[in-house]
């Protein structure tokens, strides 16, 4: 009996083993592997294989476990699949809703060191980091489907990062942390729906499983990665503030490395992609490595390039604490939407810079070369507008000119000045390197004359004999030379056309503008070197200078006055002003009359008065309608006297209103005129031949302006130094020997053009 029972048990075990052997041969595995499997592994692999039939009913062949005739095309397909797995640089895996690995390719051993047989049929939770269990559960969970029940199958995209166990040697494992390696998994969750026979509009769905591809992230050591022409790397702190950038970033994005250092990566990323970048940054801090989605990196000259980054946290070798972030970035496209500016960094970077600074004693050859180089560099770096320009506007006017309720003041235009060819330059003796923005106000500029009602209506006037041509030249000096062939169209840009540093042009310059030339003779022909505003990034605003001009000194000019000298000069002038004020307060009105040669009377500012039509040179003027008349005007020695006093309320427009309605900032173009006054020597010891016989007028609108901005040059708040009363008193005390140029700005509608304009009027008076 015992022998029979032993034989029966042996036979049963042999039959069982043969069945397991036959079952193992049915598995899609090499015979070398299946022959060494134990029974538990065969059962585990078989159940996993059966589950795969639910996911892929048509599976790996015509019928599971049945051999069939194979065609040459099928053999090619199998070989192609094998090669794809080898070149994938990753592994494919299928996970059931309960976390069981139904299938994983044999290439997993290359990245993890774990065999295919060991992983198949086991739970994936045994091979991932404990902190990633919740994330894996969320990935495998299917929510209520939003698709119609008539759709039988659909996929839900999944992309996530897992820290999987890695048993490779350190030299082959790459970057690991605690025996885990970051794997980027991307794939889809497959959902199948079924409809009920009794209720065709109701149904149920089945979560079939997750099909994904796992990729190993590149190692952190940059020396192990060959940087191609479309790649650059950067090193950043843990908050993504850039510390170091590869030089290739200049070729790919336009930014130099020093332009991006100490700035965060978020400042140079498209606003729609910052959320994805933030998520990637969070994953990087948690898991140590991450691959970002495709995002748009803003280029320097407008537009963007599509980039994908592989970032890694580098730990300190001594303390094993996170030290910094190293990222390898792949630039996938060329610059798209060139000229479209989405960042202030792009706006400031895309503006052409006009530099006029040179050495203290430049030669004529250097000046000529500098002018040519400025012209060529400016043409090559012309600014491109981020918004479409409409043909209905003037070709040189920005879009903000039309939209601004201030009528697009020429002091607040946003576009950069454009360069003229030498043939189109306004004058031969002036090197007007910048062409001024043409403004649609057909009223031009007027310099230092009295007006009657008839001239105010006719939009032009005649120069009297007392109106000297030099004053118009002085106005053209500060406001720019009118462009020839454009009639009353004036370039109202607050740029300073510089003269060429040659003796011939200097003599012509002094002969044409003797009053300004006299000022330069007193001060050694030195120009002010403050930056002037030509454009503004904000529509209708006069702030934030874009194109900057720095003037040059003439060849024979001495050193420019320093800030200390200017401060001493201004302090001395303040003392003189106070002394004159005290004397004028004590002196009666007849003494004032004896000092100035005439009694102090109120004359008119843009008022009606009767005067025979004078003869002289025709000068187009502003149509100053609806101006309030004053009482009378006083004449002295056949010359018109401008008013001594103008209240702030009587001025046409305060300078502070030149800026946009949403801004309280003063136009820097007006500030230039004030700074030119501050630089001028206002001592009464000049010769009479260096100044005109009639001193210019100081308008009351400058009182608030000087109160606010007198400190810009000296550093002290000289509150009462440059108000209209003080300047008038000083002018009387100096017997009219002082020359000053101030801007008087007036907002005036132009019905012919359909929007408002701004004209700048320079007047001269006692």
Curated annotation (Swiss-Prot):
Transcriptional factor that may have pleiotropic effects during embryogenesis and in the adult. This is Single-minded homolog 1. Efficient DNA binding requires dimerization with another bHLH protein. Heterodimer; forms a heterodimer with ARNT, ARNT2. Pfam families: bHLH_HIF1A, PAS, PAS_3, SIM_C. Residues 373-385 have a biased composition (Low complexity). SMART domains: HLH, PAC, PAS. It is found in: Nucleus. GO terms for cellular component: chromatin; nucleus. Residues 336-766 form the Single-minded C-terminal domain. It comes from Homo sapiens (Human). The keyword Transcription regulation applies. PANTHER family: HYPOXIA-INDUCIBLE FACTOR 1 ALPHA, SINGLE-MINDED HOMOLOG 1. PROSITE patterns: BHLH, PAS, SIM_C. InterPro entries: bHLH_dom (IPR011598), HLH_DNA-bd_sf (IPR036638), PAC (IPR001610), PAS (IPR000014), PAS-like_dom_sf (IPR035965), PAS_fold (IPR013767), PAS_fold_3 (IPR013655), SIM_C (IPR010578). Residues 353-365 have a biased composition (Polar residues). Keywords: Developmental protein, Differentiation, DNA-binding, Neurogenesis, Nucleus, Repeat, Transcription, Transcription regulation. SUPFAM superfamilies: HLH, helix-loop-helix DNA-binding domain, PYP-like sensor domain (PAS domain). Residues 292-335 form the PAC domain. Residues 394-404 have a biased composition (Basic and acidic residues). The gene is SIM1. A motif (Nuclear localization signal) lies at residues 368-387. GO terms for molecular function: DNA binding; DNA-binding transcription factor activity; DNA-binding transcription factor activity, RNA polymerase II-specific; protein heterodimerization activity; RNA polymerase II transcription regulatory region sequence-specific DNA binding. Residues 353-431, 528-563 are annotated as: Disordered.
């Amino acid at each position: 009996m015992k022998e029979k029972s032993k034989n029966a048990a042996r036979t049963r075990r042999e039959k069982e083993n043969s069945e397991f052997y036959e079952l193992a041969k049915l598995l899609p595995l090499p015979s070398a592997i299946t022959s060494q499997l134990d029974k538990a592994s065969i059962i585990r692999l078989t159940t996993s294989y059966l589950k795969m039939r639910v996911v892929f009913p048509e599976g790996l062949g015509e019928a599971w476990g049945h051999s069939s005739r194979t065609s040459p095309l099928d053999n090619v397909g199998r070989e192609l699949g094998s090669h794809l797995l080898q070149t994938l640089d990753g592994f494919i895996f299928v996970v059931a809703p309960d976390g069981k690995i139904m299938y994983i390719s044999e290439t997993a051993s290359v990245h993890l060191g774990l065999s295919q047989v060991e992983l198949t049929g086991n739970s994936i939770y045994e091979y991932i980091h404990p902190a990633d269990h919740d994330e894996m559960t969320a990935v495998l969970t299917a929510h209520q489907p939003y698709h119609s029940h008539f759709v039988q199958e659909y996929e839900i995209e999944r992309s996530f990062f897992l820290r999987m166990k890695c048993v490779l040697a350190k030299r082959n494992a790459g970057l690991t942390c605690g025996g885990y390696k970051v794997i980027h998994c991307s794939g889809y969750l497959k959902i199948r729906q079924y409809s009920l026979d009794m209720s065709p509009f109701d149904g149920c769905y089945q979560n079939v499983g997750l099909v994904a591809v796992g990729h190993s992230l590149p190692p952190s050591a940059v020396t192990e990665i060959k940087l191609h022409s479309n790649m650059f790397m950067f090193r950043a702190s843990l908050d993504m503030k850039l510390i170091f950038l590869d030089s290739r970033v200049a070729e790919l994005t336009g930014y130099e490395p020093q332009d991006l250092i100490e700035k965060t990566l978020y400042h140079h990323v498209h606003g729609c992609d910052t959320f994805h970048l933030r998520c990637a940054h969070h994953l990087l801090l948690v898991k140590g490595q991450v691959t970002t989605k495709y995002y748009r990196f803003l280029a320097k000259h407008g537009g963007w390039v599509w980039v994908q980054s592989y970032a890694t946290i580098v730990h300190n070798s001594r303390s094993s604490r996170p030290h910094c972030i190293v990222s390898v970035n792949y630039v996938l496209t060329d610059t798209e939407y060139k000229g479209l500016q989405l960042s202030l960094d792009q706006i400031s970077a895309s503006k052409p810079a006009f530099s006029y600074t040179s050495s203290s004693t430049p030669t004529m050859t250097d000046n000529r070369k500098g002018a040519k180089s400025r012209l060529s560099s400016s043409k090559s770096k012309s600014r491109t507008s981020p918004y479409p320009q409409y043909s209905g506007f003037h070709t040189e006017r920005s879009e903000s000119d039309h939209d601004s309720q201030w009528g697009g003041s020429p002091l607040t235009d946003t576009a950069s000045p454009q360069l003229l060819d030498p043939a189109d330059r306004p004058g031969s003796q002036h090197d007007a390197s910048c062409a001024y923005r043409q403004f649609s106000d057909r009223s031009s500029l007027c310099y230092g004359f009295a007006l009657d009602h008839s001239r105010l209506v006719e939009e032009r006037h005649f120069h009297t004999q007392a109106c000297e041509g030099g004053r118009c030249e002085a106005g053209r000096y500060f406001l720019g030379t009118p462009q020839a062939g454009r009639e009353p169209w004036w370039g109202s840009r607050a740029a300073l056309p510089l003269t060429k540093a040659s003796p011939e042009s200097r003599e012509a310059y002094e002969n044409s503008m003797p009053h300004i030339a006299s000022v330069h003779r007193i001060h050694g022909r030195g120009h002010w070197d403050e930056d002037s505003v030509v454009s503004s990034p904000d529509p209708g605003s006069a702030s934030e200078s874009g194109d900057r001009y720095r003037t040059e000194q003439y060849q024979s000019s001495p050193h420019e006055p320093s800030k200390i000298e200017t401060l001493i000069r201004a302090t001395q002038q303040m003392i003189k002003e106070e002394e004159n004020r005290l004397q004028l307060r004590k002196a009666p009105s007849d003494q004032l009359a004896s000092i100035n040669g005439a009694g102090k009377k109120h004359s008119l500012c843009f008022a009606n008065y009767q005067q025979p039509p004078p003869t002289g040179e025709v000068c187009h003027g502003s149509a100053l309608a609806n101006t309030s008349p004053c009482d009378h005007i006083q004449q002295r020695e056949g010359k018109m006297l401008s008013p001594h006093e103008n209240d702030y309320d009587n001025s046409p427009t305060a300078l502070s209103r030149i800026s946009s309605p949403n801004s309280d900032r003063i136009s820097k173009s007006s500030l230039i005129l004030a700074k030119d006054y501050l630089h001028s020597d206002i001592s009464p010891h000049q010769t009479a031949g260096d100044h005109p016989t009639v001193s210019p007028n100081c308008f009351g609108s400058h009182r608030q302006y000087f109160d606010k901005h007198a400190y810009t040059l000296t550093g002290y708040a000289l509150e009462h130094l440059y108000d209209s009363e003080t300047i008038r008193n000083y002018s009387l005390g100096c017997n009219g020997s002082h020359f000053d140029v101030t801007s008087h700005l007036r907002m005036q509608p132009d019905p012919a053009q359909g929007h408002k304009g701004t004209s700048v009027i320079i007047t001269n008076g006692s």
